[in-house]
Amino acid sequence: MILLKLYLTLAAILCQSRGTTSLDLDDLMTTNPEIQNEIINKHNDLRRTVDPPAKNMLKMSWDNIIAESAKRAALRCNQNEHTPVSGRTIGGVVCGENYFMSSNPRTWSFGIQSWFDERNYFKFGFGPTRAGVMVGHYTQVVWYKSYKMGCAINLCPNEPLKYFLVCQYC
């Protein structure tokens, strides 16, 4: 019995440390202002840590129109290709887009951090540090001219990575 309790305790701790707390889809919906704040705060916190520091980094803010566009992208459940430019042009501006997919629900902060962690393969003024590495998610998060964003999540039950998070940056 003691081993079972120890196992359950360790499992709970490990799940929390990996961004897989007991979440469900409702806990991650971006119609919730607390979730919007989590997303914006995480982006702005990470943007402040860019090295070298950006001289003119704009502060991100939530935009409901962009969030609706991200929702349309998430509803497509097309995890293999990004939304066509025509589907993410808002007010004449082509918005960037990031996807995060997982088999289990993850916090928004977990997904955003995973995009930002691509910085390990990026050198300012040069680009990717070696061929074949992914850095586009990182550059979307820290693009200095982006200042409005919106995100959405969808459950795609027919996909192996069924939790589909989308953020768009304008």
UniProtKB/Swiss-Prot annotation:
UniProt keyword Disulfide bond present: yes
InterPro entries linked: Allrgn_V5/Tpx1_CS, CAP_dom, CAP_sf, CRISP-related, SCP_CRISP, V5_allergen-like
Function field: Blocks ryanodine receptors, and potassium channels.
Keywords on record: Calcium channel impairing toxin, Disulfide bond, Ion channel impairing toxin, Neurotoxin, Potassium channel impairing toxin, Secreted, Signal, Toxin
Localization (cell): Secreted
GO molecular function terms listed in the Swiss-Prot or TrEMBL record: calcium channel regulator activity; potassium channel regulator activity; toxin activity
Protein name: Cysteine-rich venom protein VAR4
Family: Belongs to the CRISP family.
Entry keyword annotation includes Ubl conjugation: no
Tissue specificity annotation: Expressed by the venom gland.
Stored PANTHER family: CYSTEINE-RICH SECRETORY PROTEIN-RELATED
